[in-house]
Swiss-Prot record:
Stored Pfam families: CheD
Protein name: Probable chemoreceptor glutamine deamidase CheD
Catalysed conversion reaction: L-glutaminyl-[protein] + H2O = L-glutamyl-[protein] + NH4(+)
Gene: cheD
Family: Belongs to the CheD family.
Amino acid sequence: MSDRRLEAVGLGELKVADRPDQVLVCYGLGSCVGLALYDPVVRIGAMVHVVLPDSSMGRGREAPPGKYADTGVEAAVAALVDAGASRSRLIAKAAGGARMLRLAGSNPQLDIGARNTEAVRAALARHQIRLVAEDMGGTYGRTLQLFIETGRVLVSTVGRGEHEL
């Protein structure tokens, strides 16, 4: 693993990678959703760290394209196609969307994790991209990794170990 280059994808960020040694990582996903998109033929991938479900929540303020599910998926698909990926070959895997606050159970509008999860699924459906695997929901945080060389996606959780999506 020492020859791999870990690249953190921070809150609201979107990163595209095309080198075999690159590993894109979203650390500490709580209510946020980490979305990995990958073209297995040309081995190009992207990761988006979605913070909120919809860009209308920004009220006209400038925000990074990955902050919202709708703009994040749109920007990631465009960036991947620009880098040489084929929209029709893109596959998606996602993790996160947890309910991190107990208050969320009383008002669905406050359950940002569930809203992020649904918004990511809807944005992918609009772009006709298959969500082939996910680890979303629950009440615990996760870390998501995308290995560009293989397209392998790992989810790590404190106390629950690591598994492949």
